[in-house]
């Protein structure tokens, strides 16, 4: 177990014993989202852990459903280990909403996750994938399978902001920015190289950063603002000159569909990204770069000659990418 794994386990255990998260309100309001957080043990590979988790989840969720007066629910899951709970809640339909290839995640038992997912697919009535790679994988089954890419709140990210975020005060321009979780999927080494090759550019990371070369090297032109509330993202992006998506090229990132890609596009700013499959499908809007040399060239082009930027998506594109449209498609797929 690495130090990072240890801290993750401690965080998981602390959440487990937050008993307030397991309660259900006595009088929930109509259309309210109710969160039920059952006690779950980590380390599913250990003998008996899956049985214990199944018992606690089943008891907690059944209690919540009864309290809310819900019978024959539609069960929607995004994780393979839900295979252990199918059939326990009297569900009328099971939907596997696949958002990642979890078998490729570092630290997870690959074969165990694959087996869980195979079992979940077998028990599901509908399969929904958020990327083309995941759709191709799920389509090998005989179950009805649908592609549903992420949506975007275009009005929110296209809004006019008078000033930049206060956390950017004192950070020199030009600025290349990234927001969101910077973890194993992100290329720490690449960004560290870019910071060293381009000392005149400030690289700003807004969000939680998992341990990696980028945080260890303490480079003078790399700035970590920490996380900010979602409502403050437009003000943060307003102070950046170019937006970046530096991903590691791997089996894991082959399957992801970055939520922030369309959010970045909605801002109208230039974007430089690693050439992962879902980004390649929008290459007319994004500068693609793989090596540090290609990244530096693309960033220089965006910063020095912004008038030569990529074309911007039109109204027809955005009309089909709203969360309202995606929600309707989801309901159509589920009820088909």
List PLM regions with ranges.
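A short, active-site helix/loop in glycosyltransferases that binds the activated sugar's phosphate group
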Residues: 124-145
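Nucleotide-sugar-dependent
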Residues: 186, 231-236, 243-266, 272-284
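Nucleotide-activated donor-binding/catalytic signature segment of Leloir-type glycosyltransferases, i.e.
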Residues: 212-235
């Amino acid at each position: 177990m690495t130090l990072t794994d240890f801290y993750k386990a401690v965080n998981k255990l602390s959440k487990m014993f937050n008993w307030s998260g397991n309660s259900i309100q006595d009088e929930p309001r109509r259309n309210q989202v109710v969160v039920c957080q059952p006690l779950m043990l980590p380390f599913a590979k250990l003998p008996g852990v899956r049985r214990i988790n199944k018992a606690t989840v089943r008891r907690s969720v059944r209690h919540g459903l009864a309290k809310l007066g819900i019978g024959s629910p539609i069960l929607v899951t995004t994780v393979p280990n839900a295979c252990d709970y199918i059939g326990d809640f009297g569900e009328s339909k099971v939907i596997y909403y696949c958002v990642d290839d979890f078998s490729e995640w570092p630290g997870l038992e690959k074969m165990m996750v694959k087996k869980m997912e195979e079992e979940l697919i077998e028990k599901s009535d509908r399969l929904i994938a958020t990327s083309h790679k995941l759709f191709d994988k799920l389509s090998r089954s005989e179950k009805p399978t649908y592609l549903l890419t992420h949506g975007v709140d275009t009005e929110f990210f296209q809004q006019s902001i008078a000033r930049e975020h206060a956390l950017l005060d004192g950070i020199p321009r030009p600025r290349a920015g990234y927001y969101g979780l910077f973890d194993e999927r992100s290329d720490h080494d690449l960004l560290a190289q870019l910071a060293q090759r381009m000392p005149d550019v400030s690289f700003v990371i807004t969000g939680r950063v998992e341990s990696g070369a980028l945080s260890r090297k303490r480079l003078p032109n790399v700035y970590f603002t920490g996380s900010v509330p979602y409502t403050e993202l437009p003000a943060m992006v307003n102070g950046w000159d170019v937006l970046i998506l530096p991903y590691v090229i791997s089996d894991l990132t082959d399957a992801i569909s970055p939520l922030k890609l369309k959010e970045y596009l909605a801002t109208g700013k230039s974007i430089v990204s690693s050439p992962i499959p879902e980004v390649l499908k929008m290459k007319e809007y994004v500068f693609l770069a793989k090596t540090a040399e290609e990244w530096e060239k693309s960033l220089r082009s965006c910063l020095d000659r912004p008038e030569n930027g990529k074309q911007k998506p039109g109204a027809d594109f955005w009309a089909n990418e709203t969360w309202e449209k995606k929600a309707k498609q989801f309901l159509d797929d589920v009820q088909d």
